[in-house]
């Protein structure tokens, strides 16, 4: 069947058709099977047989084979060239977007408060005003109040309703607050007689005059109307101003000054001895008679010493306090009115509180600087001291208003019922007054003299000289003899010129040859043994006696202020005439006292006049002193006798050796035979500060109200408030008995770094002996309260005596500098201390854009000032050198502290920075009471603060009190808006605590302008220029502000033009900085520096992160650079505040204590070491100016703590810390972290040995057999080699201090970062490596690097792992590639875009960086380039490093532009060859700029109008041809610098910019790559010379907050390791 026949016709029958179809289908299948079988069995085999029978012959000659081989090589070349060698082109990732600005809390999602237990403080306030909430917000000014105290005040709460336009006098002792409505506060104008009710009529178009009243403030709902000082007077009714001597001594003083009526100041002292009444008349302070009108009748004549007369004086002097409105006519006016010109007082009581003050036309101006010698107040009507000055203050309702008032009777009752709580309220009020009113008047209102007149008056008031017998009996000669031999011993080593001086020896026949040293008087470096007495001695019984005769003092030579002339008339027992007239004595004064080196000294004396502040061992190399970071004063003095513990605990306070001194154990037979100078000095200080209070008829009232101790008698060492191992000088070996100062003082010493005052609103809680005992905080010791002060005083004095130091200061030494925290109180034994107001330059605070007047000093006030007594006591203070000599000519002398006076009284007790400089006018011997000891006195004896409050009440001018009444203390919650853009500018603000951010919104984008930290001012420019708000300001965290009304500023400016001058300086500085930013090309809208960071939260991403270890190392790094730091974790806070610290009842306690920590430390670290949902973790986040998110780099996903951080909606700046075990980062690993966290502002890589990051399981990949065999062979070879290498211990190399990562973070927190900018210049940039080596040799840390062109290449290599050797090696490899002519020729192409393809250039850069990202670099790095698509400069901080380094090095014409997401990038030098602005925007203050592109060749070039390249080419071989034509590369290079020359000039003029031009201009841009070693050597030499020059000139940046303290960190650390066991 060869073929299938045609099927028959079915004739229309379907069945037949179907059968035919089936049959034919089977036939077709069978036919296909036949065909397939025949093909497989016959067709294919036959075809194969035929193919094998054919034969093919190919014949190729050599040319053909050569061409074929060349073609194969060419194909292989193109395959490798464009497939293998261009793999770098595949490394393309777009740069990460810039970090999102901190969003406002209102933009975030609602807070899940139910799940986290967080109240959303940023929710909109309800329209329903809660009466109680407004009242509570008002009384928060008093700090934390216990329940009984709060209930006591609430019982007396009253309300007053005022209709719109109604007035109310509020100048009494009541406490007023606005519950609802708005009230205007008016004060009577001293220049016109005021009517009782102010009206709104204006008499002048320039100044609103409300019928003789000033508008001070406008208070809305929740604000307070009362001045705090009007309330202080209620608590100080029974306090006397000064110590009163015995009646016999009074009579002696009266006889002494009987014939000297012109000495008004002296008579005032006599009257103050006769009475505790404040003599507030102008005669007591020397006011010139300006008008024949009679003086107020309270100015009395010299009265007798009888008690009735004292009572009359006490009652009659009230009116003078309020009716004498003092006149301002100068700084210090001389005394001119004799006492006899006054009239005797009339024995009448004071007027009622509601009466208006009578204004005398003769004394209607503001107070004079010299008119502040005030004394005490009456016993009953004491409220009129503070209120008299404020009397007549009127509140007028602008709308229907409801006021809440606590009457004066409530505070009186509170004083008697809860004396301890009253003392706490006084302390809070004083603290707020010093931090708010004093700071505002001093820094912003230019009223420093108004405060200084109070200080000068206080100085006169607290003068209590030593007994005259001390001076007449040879005590001063003996004191000098004790100091002098030690100075001569040192002089024999250091001062060879004085070695042979005959006057340098002290006569052996001095007082101390006969009188042995008291065992409790341990002067510095005294001999260990003192001979027995050979002659009669002075007994201690003469301590309290007053001299019967006086030594009249001659004025000092030189300029003395008018006050000095007045004070010369004050009797002083402290000046030795021998010291003033004897040349030998003057020589002894001038000799520097330096601690001798003795073979008996086995360790450092704790009080060796602080010679050891230099941290250098003595000449024998045996001892040195290591001060702690916050030491406020001097150490405990001893004579190195073997009576202390042999172990020297370096963690203890330098004021103690860890064991108290027992006077009974040393020379008991001589105890009563020697004059105890320390005890005498301490007694005088105790009288001056009010620690001694005499018992009178109302002693029981005093004991109940003011002398009650502030520590409960229930305190026991077993209390939870006792931290373990809290060895203090007050406990020592007697731990079993209760300490003298109670458990709170142990808490103060619980940490060696905690020397601050436990104050603020938390004082009450810190004193709880049992945190769960609610009544313990307001209880008191019955024995102490009823038994008077004698026993308590004796115990306190016995303990405090050990802390008194006797110091010698050379003439010209600076004891305290303006703007620094006072180290303590100085009692002048002999000599004079001068208080002067330093000249404030308007350019002194231009450095910090956020700085306010005086804030520049404040940065160093936390560290350096505490150690100043150590240096200045020996004249070794380096800070007084040339700067002091130049500035002393401009300083304005204010007053002189004479023997018996106290310097630093106000600043020490108020815990404020000093407003003046205190210098030694002559060689001085002073008694020094350290600041921490004063704090303990304050804690134990509130009478000291009450006395200060009483004195301030009587001495402060009405202007300061009116300012205090007008200032408003305001509190903002986190996220709350202070004011919005477009609001009316009615007030400006000062930040007390917290942080705020200013921003503007444009096109739905938020642009952060700046951030405000502690002591920064907000909005004053808008107020002065009378424009609407130009920005929106909101609180980053809970913040405390001072609101200064514009009305107050206007009122003060009229009377005090210096206030306007002060503000004009402030505004001029702001405008000047703004113009400077504009001239320097600063990009608008970018945030300014944020150096003023106070609180830092250390938050781990997960529970496994070692935040405690990280924070501990960070704290040590902060203190090593000189920044005092408070370390707070949950355990420390609970030990201080009790177990209820984080409960709702303890919220105010925690807030007050944390605010106090911020006030006393440069930086506060909040360590979140508790579970995520705990209250402490939430507190850490809420309190932070900056949040450091610490992670170990194991999992880039968000951790539980980070989720909590986002849920709290905090708007604080957030930065990421990635911990690594070694100094290397896996390429690309950082990008995953940053991409998941767009809210991170910046990140840091930190090396923390011991961090174990578990390796992720890698999916198994089956290698080919050949690769597996090769790996097996490699392992075998490595195993065999290890046998011959031996066992070596694994030692991790210790990083040098300038490469410490924790120090880098610390410098960032303190705003002390050092940046490095490396400029472009082709091959000349090889010299950058030499500069880097010079920086390492000088130990200069580098915290950030920026580069342009070749500078980005070298800087990027160094920033990668900070390895100088690797940087030099890879740069040399790149130079070899660029110097190879063959590589350049192989890359040449048709010059349409450029002469080369750029491939070889790309390969050279890629071989140096490979696939590393910029964010993987160990040090923050950026490179700049020029975007020719959009004609702008680009700054690259993320992305593949090789690409953006290549973009920054793209020289147009030689290389094609780099395409990055459609943008064409070329060399950054076309825009800015030394880009410093990106570093400035990151808050880096000191920037070292290395410029290698400067072209100094400006010689004229003349070569005609046309140039033949061939002619120049052939003339290259002509030795006599001088080429004057620039090559293309040189022209292109110069073209780069033409565009950036203006920017370079701005860089040179930028403050904080250290510019160096490398002398490498003789090298070509490309040809210099062949001379690598030569260029690098030139850079190293130039770098060394420049850094050495800067160091000699004092311009070398070190990154230290405190130069003196931080420079010794390395030496201290090394020596401690060598001397440890």
From Swiss-Prot:
- Per the annotation, the residue ranges of the short sequence motif GXGXXG are 1320-1325
Which of this chain's residues are annotated to bind a nucleoside 3',5'-cyclic phosphate 2? 951-1070
**Which topology term describes how it sits in the membrane?**
Multi-pass membrane protein
Which residues are on the Cytoplasmic side of the membrane? 1-12, 81-1621
Q: Which residues lie on this side of the membrane: Lumenal?
A: 34-59
Enzyme Commission identifier(s) = 3.1.1.5
Regarding protein family, the annotation reads: Belongs to the NTE family.
- Report the protein name in the record: Lysophospholipase NTE1
């Amino acid at each position: 069947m060869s073929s299938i026949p045609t099927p028959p016709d079915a004739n229309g029958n379907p069945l037949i058709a179907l059968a035919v179809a089936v049959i034919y289908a089977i036939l077709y299948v069978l036919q296909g099977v036949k065909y397939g079988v025949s093909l497989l069995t016959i067709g294919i085999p036959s075809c194969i047989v035929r193919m094998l029978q054919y034969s093919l012959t190919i014949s190729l000659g050599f040319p053909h084979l050569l061409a074929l081989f060349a073609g194969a090589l060419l194909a292989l070349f193109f395959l490798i060239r464009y497939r293998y060698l261009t793999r770098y082109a595949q490394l393309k990732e777009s740069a990460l977007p810039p970090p999102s600005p901190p969003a406002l809390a209102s933009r975030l999602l609602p807070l899940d408060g139910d799940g986290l237990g967080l109240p959303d403080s940023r929710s909109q306030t309800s329209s329903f005003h809660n009466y109680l909430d407004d009242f509570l917000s008002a009384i928060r000014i008093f700090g934390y109040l216990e329940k009984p105290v709060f209930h006591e005040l609430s019982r007396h709460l009253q309300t007053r309703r005022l209709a719109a336009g109604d007035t109310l006098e509020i100048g009494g002792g009541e406490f007023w607050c606005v519950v609802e409505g708005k009230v205007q506060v008016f004060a009577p104008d001293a220049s016109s007689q005021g009517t009782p009710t102010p009206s709104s009529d204006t008499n002048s178009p320039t100044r609103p005059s409300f019928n003789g009243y000033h508008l001070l403030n406008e208070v809305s709902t929740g604000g307070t109307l009362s001045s705090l000082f009007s309330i202080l007077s209620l608590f100080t009714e029974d306090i006397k101003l000064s110590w009163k001597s015995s009646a016999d001594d009074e009579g002696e003083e009266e006889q002494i000054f009987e014939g000297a009526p012109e000495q008004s100041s002296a008579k005032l002292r006599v009257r103050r001895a006769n009475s505790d009444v404040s003599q507030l008349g102008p005669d007591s302070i020397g006011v010139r008679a300006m008008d024949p009108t009679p003086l107020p009748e309270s100015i009395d004549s010299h009265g007798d010493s009888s008690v009735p007369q004292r009572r009359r004086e006490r009652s009659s002097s009230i009116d003078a306090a309020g009716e004498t409105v003092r006149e301002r006519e100068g700084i210090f006016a001389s005394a001119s009115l004799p006492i006899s010109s006054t009239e005797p007082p009339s024995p009448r009581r004071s007027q009622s509180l509601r009466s208006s003050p009578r204004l005398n036309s003769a004394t209607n101006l503001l107070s004079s600087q010299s008119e502040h010698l005030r004394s005490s107040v009456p016993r009953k009507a004491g409220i009129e001291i503070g209120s008299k000055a404020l009397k007549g203050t009127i509140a007028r309702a602008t709308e229907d208003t409801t006021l809440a008032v606590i009457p004066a009777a409530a505070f009186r009752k509170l004083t008697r019922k809860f004396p301890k709580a009253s003392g706490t309220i006084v302390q809070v009020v004083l603290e707020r007054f010093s931090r708010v009113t004093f700071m505002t008047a001093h820094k912003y209102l230019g009223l420093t003299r108004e405060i200084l007149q109070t200080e000068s008056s206080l100085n006169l008031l607290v003068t209590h000289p030593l007994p005259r017998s001390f001076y007449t009996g040879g005590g001063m000669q003996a004191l000098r003899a004790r100091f002098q031999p030690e100075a001569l011993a040192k002089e024999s080593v250091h001062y060879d010129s004085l070695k042979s001086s005959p006057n340098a020896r002290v006569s052996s026949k001095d007082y101390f040859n006969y009188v042995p040293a008291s065992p409790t008087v341990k002067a510095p470096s005294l001999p260990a043994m003192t001979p027995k007495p050979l002659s009669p001695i002075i007994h201690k019984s003469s301590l309290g006696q007053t001299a019967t005769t006086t030594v009249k003092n001659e004025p000092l030579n030189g300029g003395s202020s008018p006050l000095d002339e007045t004070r010369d008339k004050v009797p002083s027992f402290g000046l030795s005439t021998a010291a003033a007239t004897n040349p030998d004595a003057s020589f002894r004064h001038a000799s520097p006292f330096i601690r001798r080196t003795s073979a008996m000294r086995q360790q450092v004396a704790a009080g060796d006049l602080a010679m050891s502040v230099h941290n250098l061992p003595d000449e024998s190399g045996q001892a040195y002193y290591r001060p702690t970071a916050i030491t406020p004063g001097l150490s405990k003095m001893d004579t190195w006798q073997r009576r202390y513990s042999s172990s020297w605990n370096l963690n203890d306070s330098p004021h103690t050796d860890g064991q108290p001194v027992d006077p009974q154990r040393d020379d008991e037979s001589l105890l009563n035979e020697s004059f105890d100078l320390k005890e005498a000095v301490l007694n005088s200080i105790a009288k001056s500060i009010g620690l001694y209070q005499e018992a009178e008829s109302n002693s029981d009232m005093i004991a109940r109200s003011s002398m009650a101790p502030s520590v409960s008698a229930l305190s026991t060492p077993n209390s939870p408030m006792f931290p373990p191992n809290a060895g203090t000088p007050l406990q020592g070996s007697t731990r079993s008995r209760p300490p003298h100062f109670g458990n709170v003082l142990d808490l103060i010493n619980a940490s060696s770094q905690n020397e601050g005052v436990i104050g603020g609103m938390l004082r009450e809680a810190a004193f709880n002996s049992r945190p769960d005992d609610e009544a313990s905080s307001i209880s008191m010791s019955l024995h102490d309260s009823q038994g008077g002060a004698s026993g308590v005083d004796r115990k306190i004095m016995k303990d405090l005596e050990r802390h008194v130091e006797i110091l010698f200061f050379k003439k010209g030494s600076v004891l305290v500098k303006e703007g620094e925290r006072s180290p303590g109180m100085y009692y002048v034994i002999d000599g004079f201390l001068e208080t002067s107001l330093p000249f404030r330059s308007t350019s002194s605070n231009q450095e910090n854009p956020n700085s306010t007047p005086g804030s520049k000093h404040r940065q160093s006030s936390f560290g350096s000032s505490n150690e100043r007594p150590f240096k200045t006591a020996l004249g070794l203070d380096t800070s007084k050198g040339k700067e002091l000599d130049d500035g002393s000519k401009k300083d304005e002398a204010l007053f002189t502290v004479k023997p018996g006076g106290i310097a630093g009284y106000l600043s020490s007790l108020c815990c404020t920075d000093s407003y003046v400089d205190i210098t030694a006018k002559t060689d001085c011997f002073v008694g020094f009471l350290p600041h921490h000891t004063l704090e303990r006195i304050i804690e134990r004896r509130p009478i000291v603060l009450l006395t200060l409050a009483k004195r301030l009440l009587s001495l402060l001018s009405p202007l300061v009190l009116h300012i205090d009444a007008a200032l408003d203390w305001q509190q903002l919650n986190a996220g709350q808006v202070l004011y919005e853009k477009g609001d009316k500018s009615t007030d400006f603000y000062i930040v007390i605590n917290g942080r705020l951010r200013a921003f503007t919104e444009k096109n739905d984008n938020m642009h952060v302008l700046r951030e405000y930290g502690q002591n920064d001012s907000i909005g004053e420019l808008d107020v002065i220029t009378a424009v609407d708000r130009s920005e929106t300001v909101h609180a980053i965290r809970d913040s405390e502000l001072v609101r200064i009304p514009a009305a107050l500023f206007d009122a003060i400016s009229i009377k005090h033009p210096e206030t306007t001058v002060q503000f004009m300086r402030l505004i001029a500085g702001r405008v000047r900085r703004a113009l400077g930013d504009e001239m320097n090309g600063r990009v608008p809208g970018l945030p300014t520096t944020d150096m003023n960071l106070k609180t830092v939260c250390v938050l781990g991403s997960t529970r496994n992160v070692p935040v405690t270890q990280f924070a501990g190392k960070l704290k040590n790094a902060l203190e090593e650079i000189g920044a005092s730091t408070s370390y707070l974790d949950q355990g420390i806070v609970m030990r201080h505040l009790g177990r209820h610290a984080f409960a709702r009842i303890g919220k105010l306690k925690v807030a007050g204590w944390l605010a106090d920590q911020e006030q006393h430390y440069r930086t506060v670290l909040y360590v979140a070491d508790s579970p995520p949902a705990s209250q402490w973790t939430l507190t850490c986040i809420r309190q932070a100016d900056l949040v450091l998110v610490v992670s170990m780099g194991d999992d880039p996903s968000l951790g539980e703590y980070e989720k909590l951080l986002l849920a709290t909606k905090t708007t604080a700046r957030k930065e990421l810390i990635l911990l690594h075990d070694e100094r290397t980062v896996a390429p690309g690993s950082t990008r995953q972290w940053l991409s998941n966290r767009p809210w991170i502002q910046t990140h840091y890589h930190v090396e923390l040995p011991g961090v174990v990051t578990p390796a992720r399981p890698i999916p198994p990949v089956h290698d080919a057999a050949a690769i597996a065999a090769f790996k097996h062979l490699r392992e075998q070879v490595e195993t065999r080699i290890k046998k011959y290498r031996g066992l070596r211990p694994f030692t991790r190399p210790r990083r040098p201090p300038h490469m410490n990562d924790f120090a880098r973070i610390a410098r960032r927190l303190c705003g002390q970062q050092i940046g490095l900018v490396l400029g472009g210049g082709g091959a000349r940039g090889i010299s950058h490596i030499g500069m880097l080596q010079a920086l390492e040799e000088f130990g200069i840390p580098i915290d950030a690097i920026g580069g342009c062109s070749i500078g980005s290449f070298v800087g990027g290599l160094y920033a990668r792992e900070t390895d100088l050797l690797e940087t030099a090696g890879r740069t040399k490899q790149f130079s070899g590639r660029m110097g190879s002519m063959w590589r350049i020729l192989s890359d040449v192409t048709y010059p349409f875009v450029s002469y080369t393809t750029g491939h070889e250039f790309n390969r050279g850069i890629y071989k140096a960086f490979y696939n590393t990202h910029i964010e993987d670099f160990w040090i923050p790095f950026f490179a700049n380039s020029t975007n020719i698509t959009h004609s702008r400069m680009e700054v690259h901080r993320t992305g593949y490093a090789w690409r953006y380094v290549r973009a920054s090095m793209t020289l147009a014409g030689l290389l094609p532009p780099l395409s990055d997401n459609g943008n064409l990038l070329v060399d950054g030098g076309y825009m800015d060859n030394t880009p410093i602005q990106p570093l400035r925007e990151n808050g880096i203050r000191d920037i070292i700029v290395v410029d290698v592109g400067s072209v100094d060749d400006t010689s004229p070039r003349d070569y005609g109008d046309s140039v033949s390249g061939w002619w120049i080419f052939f003339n290259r071989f002509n030795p006599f041809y001088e080429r004057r034509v620039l090559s293309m590369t040189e022209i292109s290079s110069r073209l780069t610098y033409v565009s950036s020359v203006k920017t370079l000039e701005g860089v040179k003029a930028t403050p904080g910019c250290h510019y160096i031009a490398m002398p490498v201009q003789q090298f070509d841009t490309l040809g210099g790559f062949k001379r690598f070693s030569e260029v690098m050597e030139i850079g190293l030499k130039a770098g060394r010379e420049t850094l050495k020059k800067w160091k000699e000139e004092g311009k070398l940046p070190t990154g230290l907050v405190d130069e003196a303290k931080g420079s010794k960190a390395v030496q201290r650390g090394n020596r401690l390791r060598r001397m440890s066991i």
